[in-house]
Each structure stands twice: as C-alpha cells, then as structure tokens.
C-alpha cells in the first residue's frame, strides 16, 4: 500500500500540492479558515433571543452543527457572518494555506484540496451588467493516485457547476518543477488546466484565466468527521452546514452552503461533466474584437428597426423622416430592451452558471 500512516499522509498532500496562478487583475484573494473565524460572528436564530458568538472557533462551528445533528441549514437560520472588509482576502498571500484531505475508493487515493475565499466576484454580462457575486467561496481540486504505486492518474479541476468541471488525465496535467499547476479564474476562482478565455453560457459568463500571480501555498492536513484522527478544535469548520458568509439578519441566504460537502470525492465518471472550450489568450483577443463588432451591429439594427417601427406606427410620417418625438420613443424602448437583457443575463447566470 502506498499510504501507511499519518506521516505518509502529510508528505503525500505536500508532494502533490499545486501551484496556483491567479489573474493579475484579481481583487478577491484566498484566506485561511482561522482568519475568517476570528473576524466573524456565528449567529443562531433558532434561539430566543438569537445567539451570537465572536470571535468564532472551530469548536464553535463543530458544536453548533452537532447541536442540529449535522443537518444542512440553507434558510439563513445559522450564519457565519462577516463584513465586506474581508472580501479582498488575507495578506500576505504567501502565508495563506490550503487544506488537504485524503480518501480512498475503488483502489485509488483521492487528495481533496480546498481553497477558501471571503468573496466570489461578479461576472460581466457583455459589459452591461454584473451578476453571480456573493459572500464566500470554496474551490476544490482533487488529485487521483493509484493506491498501490502512488502514480498520478488524473486531476479534477473544480470550476462552478458540472458544466465546467473536468477530469484531466495525467499526461495532460500541466506541471512546473514537479508540481501540478492550476489556473484560477478572475474573481470567480474556478480552476482550469490552462490559461485563456473559458467560454461559458453562450459567452454570457466567461471565465478569464492567465498566468499572473504565482501562489504556492502550504497544506494543512485535515480528516473526515468519521475518522479517529479528526480533531474538532482544528477541523470543526469541515462539519459546518450553515450559511458561510452574509449578514447577521435572520433569513439571509446570500452566503454559500457546503463547507462540509466540499470534503467529498466528486463523481469520478468523466462523462458526467461538460467542460467548456478554453480559447488561447491570442485567440481570445480576436474573439473580443469580433464580439464587440457583433454587439455594435446588433445595437445598430435594434435602433434602426425601432426607428422604422416608430416612423410607421407612431409618427406615420414619410419614410425616413425621424423627428424629436421619434428619438425620445426610441430611447425609451431601447432602454427597456437593455433592462430586459440585463435581467435575462442575471437569471441565466444564476440558474445555469452558478459560481
């Protein structure tokens, strides 16, 4: 067996720990659980009056989850709340750890690396609106090894929904100085195996990935809650099923749920995922030019069509004659179309491209 004892476990998570490249324009950086806890308030709205705990410890997170039988709480009755001042993340980034957990399944070892953030940033909807932002973010990368030899088999790059997650075979995994490389998307933090523009949801919520800021974090070893090596005072956050992020208000469900769920092995069937196309940085530049040109054409023909309709059905003047009234009506109609487009973009991103 490749894995024998706890000393092996720490050395294994260290050996396969990745190098991350963040986008050079990133403004929401990673953070540690301890940093989040000491700057947060844990709220339980199921008591009367509500119970507030601050600063928070891992033992607090474990105890409140145990109190409610480790049930998933999504309604905003239990919240680990923190303010916007934490959104930029913890500095210096070189001191921020990631978390590594080892599981075995079907003759394979899975190392689950977890990265924490205080903020998931916004997506720009073709430059007209932003959507997808929310407090807190947890990203996952999984390394699959042969249980007997320790040979690298695959790497799972976690990125948002199943539509963009991907298992990458060992031969195609990027390496640098013997380390696996993962590229982190701008603001949304999805992980990918190479830089470029990730085409998502028909271009509505693209991810932008580049070889920008290098981050090679140390790994804190954690264990599953059912393991005899599990230490609640150090790992209690992994048992937390309440809302991670948001205000202290009852019913605030703006934060995420799932710190505990991020410790599971993802579906190992690669066919279950639908990874998007990643365009190279060079190709992306041309695509942006084409996209901007297409948007201008669309706007032009919308305005042109509205003007003609205004002339025909409202003004009823000679063809091609547009007066002040026509332009006012055109502006109003066009503004309404833009608002509809923005609402549609928000709906599509939140429903089909969750962050």
Q: Model segments located where?
A:
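Short beta-strand micro-motifs enriched in acidic
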Residues: 144-148
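Membrane-interfacial hairpin junctions
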Residues: 310-324
């Amino acid at each position: 067996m490749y894995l024998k004892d706890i000393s092996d476990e720490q050395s294994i998570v260290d050996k396969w720990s990745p190098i991350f490249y963040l986008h050079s324009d990133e403004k929401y950086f990673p953070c540690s659980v301890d940093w989040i806890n000491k700057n947060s308030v844990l709220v339980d709205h199921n008591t009367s009056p509500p119970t507030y705990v601050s600063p928070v410890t891992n033992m607090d997170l474990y105890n409140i989850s145990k109190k409610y039988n480790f049930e998933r709480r999504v309604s905003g009755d239990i919240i680990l709340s923190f303010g916007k001042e934490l959104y930029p993340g913890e500095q210096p980034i070189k001191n921020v750890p990631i978390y590594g957990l080892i599981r075995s399944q079907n003759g394979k070892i899975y190392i689950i690396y977890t990265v924490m953030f205080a903020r998931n940033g916004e997506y720009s909807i073709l430059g007209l609106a932003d959507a997808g932002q929310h407090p807190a973010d947890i990203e996952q990368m999984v390394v699959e090894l042969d249980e007997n030899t320790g040979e690298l088999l695959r790497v799972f790059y976690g990125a948002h929904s199943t539509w963009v997650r991907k298992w990458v075979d060992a031969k195609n995994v990027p390496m640098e100085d013997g380390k696996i490389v993962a590229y982190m998307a701008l603001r949304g933090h999805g992980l990918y195996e190479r830089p470029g523009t990730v085409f998502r949801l028909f271009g509505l919520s693209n991810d932008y990935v580049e070889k920008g800021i290098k981050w090679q974090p140390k790994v804190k070893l954690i264990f599953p809650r059912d393991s005899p090596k599990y230490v609640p005072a150090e790992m209690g956050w992994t048992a937390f099923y309440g809302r991670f992020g948001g205000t202290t208000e009852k019913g605030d469900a703006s934060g995420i749920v799932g710190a505990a769920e991020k410790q599971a092995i993802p579906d190992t069937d690669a066919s279950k995922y639908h990874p998007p196309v990643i365009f190279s940085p060079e190709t992306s530049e041309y695509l942006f030019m084409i996209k901007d040109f297409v948007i201008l054409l669309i706007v032009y023909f919308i305005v042109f069509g509205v003007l003609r309709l205004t002339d025909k059905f409202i003004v009823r003047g000679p063809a091609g004659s547009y007066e002040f009234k026509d332009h006012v009506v055109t502006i109003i109609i066009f503004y309404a179309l833009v608002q509809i487009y923005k609402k549609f973009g928000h709906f599509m991103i939140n429903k089909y491209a969750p962050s």
